[in-house]
Amino acid sequence: MAPNTNSGRTKAAPRAASSRPTAVLVLSDGSLFKGRGFGAAVTNVGEVCFNTSMTGYQEIMTDPSYAGQIITFTFPHIGNVGANGKDHETGAPSALGMITRQLPTAPANWRSESSLEAWMVAHDLPGIAGVDTRALTRHIRDAGAPTGVICHNPDGVFDIDALAAQARDWPGLAGMDLAIEVTRDAEATWDEGSWDFLSATHLTTDAAHRVVAMDFGCKDNILRCLIDAGCDLSLIHI
């Protein structure tokens, strides 16, 4: 099965009532993890890594430094604040998939605009829950970040041998020009500061410094910090 090329979005079907796995994670060394799928019903291949943060999963998934990676979240309650249109670190997700211990929890936050699962479907991102994330994290720690294929199929039908071959055949991140993929495609100005919870908007400041930033995959929060510091900010791309 070929990796997702983002040529179209595939809506995830409702979860089946049976205990049959609806998603798998297959590593290049042959390790197999079965679980419950969520998000988009697609297949992606990338480098499997882990993140121990307790909050900020939307920022992490849209962080350009995670381009080409499938992220294992070690904190169990992923999804509890939902998702919104303000907390992206770039215009679109850079990560390729999500691995969790539990299915995303229902959002309970006043800034939430959608559930995490709906957000992942909208961005063509597959997820797998029910994975022993501690065991997977130890595996990554001891053996290094492996290539993996994450496949979400609501029908629960998987060609494990083909997925394992796809993982083995992926060339890996070494040598990839990821900056081209995560860089903005046009020059722009930036005037958005940090989020202010009292006014429910991004702050702006009087500019005291003229700054030109060359974008090689810059996080939006870095740019917000420059605005907070009083910079008149322009972005140029490579």
Regions found by a protein language model. Name each.
Residues 1-29:
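Generic start-of-chain signal for non-secretory N-termini
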Residues 18-22, 28-159:
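Feature captures the catalytic cores and cofactor-binding loops of soluble hydro-lyases/lyases
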Residues 20, 140-210:
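Flexible inter-domain linker/hinge segments
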Residues 121, 224-227:
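Class I S-adenosyl-L-methionine
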Residues 124-127, 208-212:
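Short active-site oxyanion
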Residues 214-216, 220-225:
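Glycine-rich phosphate/diphosphate-binding loop of Rossmann-like nucleotide-binding domains
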Residues 230-233:
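A generic structural motif
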Residues 236-238:
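Conserved small/polar residues in nucleotide/adenosyl-binding loops
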